[in-house]
A protein has these predicted regions:
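Core catalytic region of metal-dependent phosphoesterases/phosphodiesterases
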Residues: 2, 15-115, 185-196, 221, ...
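Short aromatic-enriched loop/helix-cap "lid" or pocket-rim segments at secondary-structure transitions
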Residues: 14-19, 90-92, 132-134, 186, ...
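Structural motif
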Residues: 3, 46, 118-119, 170-172, ...
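Conserved beta-sheet core of the metallophosphoesterase superfamily
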Residues: 77, 179-241
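Short amphipathic alpha-helix with an adjacent loop that forms part of the alpha/beta core around
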Residues: 38-39, 159-164, 238-241
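N-terminal, positively charged/glycine-rich alpha-helical extensions of SAM-dependent methyltransferases
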Residues: 1-7
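Conserved catalytic scaffold of divalent metal-dependent phosphoesterases
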Residues: 9-11, 91-184
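Active-site metal-binding loops of divalent metal-dependent hydrolases
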Residues: 7-11, 51-54, 82-84, 111, ...
Length: 241
């Protein structure tokens, strides 16, 4: 069994929110996802999807997008992104999937899972700079950042419980937002990563930055971009430290 990651699928099965307007790389991106995903992911593998999964505004409207995701090879662990307005409680999401026969999707949000070579955990995170919030409206930056730091700590505390069973397994964090981007640093999130000695963190959210290195190090932590367009819509193998 292998572990992969790819964020920012931005699914729109009814094409009400086409991604084609964002450039040639996004043309027919759902077809690319289906082809490339199934080419590298086997049925026994797991793919982590850290947010921005469906453009739907309501959970009931997201069914076809989840059916598409469910049809792809492997198990999926999904996190929350800033565009996932359909997101609901864990119980409501699981009931919705169970009712509609969706069996390969589970939640990675304030919790943790153990795999053969690492323990994975994650949450959404938040914008690295207050000025970026224009994409979702007026919110209280400091309040939400602190809340997201608490959620990350909850997830890492669950991961630590699993790590107690095998001290050699590293903790790998999956966020939607990058804790570090260019000269901006989300110190609240970064401090939690240091507190739990995290050395590997994956993030999405950033689009069109195809020139940057896939992995960059900051304060001893490897930060790896896993946005779907950066990966050319091919899930990336997760390499633990």
């Amino acid at each position: 069994m292998s572990l992969f990651v790819m964020a920012d699928l931005h699914l729109s099965s009814d094409r009400s929110k086409s991604m084609d307007i964002f450039g040639a790389r996004w043309q027919d991106h759902m077809k690319k996802i289906e082809k490339n995903w199934n080419a590298v992911v086997s049925p026994e593998d797991t793919v982590i999807v850290p947010g921005d999964i469906s453009w739907s505004l309501r959970l009931e409207d997201s069914l076809e997008d989840f059916r598409f995701l469910d049809s792809l090879n492997g198990q999926k662990l999904i996190g929350k992104g800033n565009h996932d307005f359909w997101w609901s409680t864990h119980s409501k999401l699981r009931t919705f999937w169970e009712t509609n026969g969706i069996k390969s999707i589970n939640i990675l949000y304030n919790n943790a899972y153990r795999f053969d070579d690492c323990i994975v955990c994650g949450t959404r995170g938040w914008f690295v700079e207050e000025a970026q919030q224009h994409t979702i409206g007026e919110v209280e930056y400091a309040k939400i950042v602190n809340r997201e730091a608490i959620r990350l700590r909850l997830s890492l505390e669950e991961a630590k419980k699993l790590q107690d069973q095998d001290k050699n397994l590293p903790l790998v964090v999956f966020l939607h937002f990058p804790p570090v981007w260019n000269e901006f640093v989300c110190r609240e999130i970064l401090d939690v990563l240091h507190e739990f000695d995290v050395k590997s963190c994956y993030f999405g959210h950033i689009h069109g930055a195809y020139h940057i290195p896939r992995t960059q190090q900051f304060e001893g932590i490897d930060f790896t971009i896993c946005a779907a367009d950066y990966l050319n819509f091919t899930p990336l193998p997760v390499w633990s430290i």
